[in-house]
A protein has these predicted regions:
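Bacterial Sec-dependent N-terminal signal peptides
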Residues: 1-26
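Short, contiguous alpha-helical
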Residues: 40-44, 48-51, 61-99, 140-193
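Well-ordered alpha-helical scaffold segments within catalytic/enzyme domains
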Residues: 49, 53-54, 88, 118-126
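Polybasic, low-complexity association/targeting segments
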Residues: 98-106
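Acidic/histidine-rich alpha-helical segments that form the ligand environment
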Residues: 106-139, 145-161
């Protein structure tokens, strides 16, 4: 009898538990193009700190180079601008306009304008990309890679040279944008929009 009572209690408990409505889980809303969305976000952040760096550093430091073996501050900005055309022309399936900014521009105003123009050219590649179109294969540096890989390579290149510029800025006692809490708060607010 005791075993029967325990069995009835267990069955009743199970029935009550199973009869309850399952908790409603809120599933995350899937983003239509999660890979390109993240790549675009990463690019946008790199672009923001690069432009802020170019604007923040005084023109007198544009010719600064820590050693003779490396590019000057201004040459790095020109190189990054040239690279925007290189990477993004491949991603867009266009001929590289190759403006040769690194070799032809040296003033702060000219380099900032060139950098803004180069980023505007690249913006179109990032904005027009989807996860599907990003999987299309293209040739880059002799390798067949997906278009999205080209844009990821561009992001990596921006980050690499931003790292160079951070060192140059620190050598001149300038706080880089990524270490400026007010600037980073501003960036985070724009990302959340």
């Amino acid at each position: 009898m005791r075993k029967l009572t325990i069995l009835i209690i267990l069955v009743a408990t199970a029935a009550v538990t199973l009869a309850q409505a399952p908790p409603k889980a809120t599933a995350p809303v899937p983003q239509a193009n999660p890979f390109t969305a993240y790549t675009r976000l990463n690019y946008w952040g790199g672009k923001a700190v690069m432009l802020r760096t170019a604007e923040q550093v005084p023109e007198e430091y544009y010719s600064f180079r820590p050693t003779d073996a490396v590019r000057s501050f201004g040459q790095i900005l020109g190189h990054v601008a040239d690279a925007q055309y290189y990477f993004c022309s491949v991603a867009r399936g266009e001929k590289n306009p190759f403006p040769n900014i690194e070799k032809t521009k040296s003033s702060k105003a000219d380099l900032i304008t060139a950098l803004k123009d180069a980023f505007a050219y690249c913006d179109q590649a990032y904005e027009g990309m989807t996860d599907v179109s990003g999987s299309e294969m293209v040739m880059l540096m002799g390798f067949k890679i997906p278009k999205l890989g080209v844009l990821i390579g561009n992001n990596q290149h921006i980050s690499e040279h931003y790292g160079n510029l951070v060192t140059y800025m620190r050598l001149k006692n300038i706080v880089p944008p990524s270490s400026d809490p007010a600037f980073m708060r501003q960036i985070m607010q724009q990302i959340k929009k």
